[in-house]
UniProtKB/Swiss-Prot annotation:
Any one GO biological process: translation
InterPro entries from the UniProt entry: KH_dom, KH_dom-like_a/b, KH_dom_type_2, KH_sf_prok-type, Ribosomal_S3_C_sf, Ribosomal_uS3_arc, Ribosomal_uS3_C, Ribosomal_uS3_CS
Annotated organism of origin: Methanococcus maripaludis (strain C6 / ATCC BAA-1332)
Name of the gene this protein is made from: rps3
Protein name, per record: Small ribosomal subunit protein uS3
Subunit details: Part of the 30S ribosomal subunit.
Cross-referenced PROSITE patterns: KH_TYPE_2, RIBOSOMAL_S3
Keyword field contains Cell membrane: no
Family matches, as CDD domains: KH-II_30S_S3_arch
GO molecular function: rRNA binding; structural constituent of ribosome
Free-text function comment from the UniProt entry: Binds the lower part of the 30S subunit head.
Domain KH type-2 stretches: 16-85
Family listed: Belongs to the universal ribosomal protein uS3 family.
Gene Ontology terms: cellular component: cytosolic small ribosomal subunit
Keyword terms, alphabetized: Ribonucleoprotein, Ribosomal protein, RNA-binding, rRNA-binding
Length: 211
């Protein structure tokens, strides 16, 4: 019973996160922290622009609260909004900006390079951006852009690297955008992957059916 409840809560939080991700596009949504209290459920929303989460005269936050209560069966939801202090070090926000730029027709390479400069300029120890899908033409491929220090696998990668995956809907199809950031304050282990100061690009092609 405890395990079933735990799984149910995780699924619920994931659905709420997806709802906020869609609803709070203009707010620069990052993530939520959901905690149950004796009087209800406290949901802390982290975003680049808290004003968009609250809305004019609190209209948006009221709408979010009502939706959580009626459609997601959240008991007495209490929404608190916190601003992300360093948006260029938040992989969700960085990934969303990249996806939005791609949807507006910006070239993926220029967009990725610009994002990496902002991330590293904010003091990150390392950053990796992976763009996958039909970027041009009918053939799917994966483009990787990296700078700084990055741990790619094992426990250090899970503990030290913040990751996010976003989707960009283009005319040729859906493109995946993965962002990995190693923040300035992390303590690096002895074994790390050292990249040069130049942004590196790696292209990987995969088979895709011709339409």
């Amino acid at each position: 019973m405890i395990e079933r409840t735990f799984v149910g809560e995780n699924v619920s939080e994931t659905l709420i996160d997806e709802y906020f991700k869609t609803k709070l596009v203009r707010a620069g949504y990052s993530h939520i922290d959901l905690k149950k209290t004796p009087i209800g459920t406290r949901i802390t929303v982290f975003a680049e622009k808290p004003g968009f989460v609250i809305g004019r005269k609190g209209k948006m936050v009221k709408e979010l609260t009502e939706t959580l209560s009626t459609e997601y069966a959240v008991n007495n939801p209490q929404i608190e909004v916190k601003q992300v202090e360093s948006p260029d070090l938040d992989p969700a926000i960085v990934g969303h900006k990249i996806a939005s730029s791609l949807e507006r027709g910006m070239h993926f390479r220029k967009t990725a390079h610009s994002a990496i400069r902002r991330v590293m300029g904010s003091g990150a120890k390392g950053v990796a951006i992976i763009v996958s899908g039909k970027l041009s033409g009918e053939r799917s491929r994966t483009e990787k852009f990296m700078d700084g220090y990055m741990k790619h696998c094992g426990e250090p990668a899970e503990a030290l690297v913040n990751k996010s995956h976003q989707l960009a809907k283009l005319k040729l199809g859906v493109v995946g955008v993965t962002v990995k950031i190693m923040k300035p304050d992390v303590s690096l282990p002895d074994e790390i992957t050292i990249l040069s100061g130049e942004i590196k690009e790696v292209t990987e092609y995969s088979e895709a059916s011709q339409e």
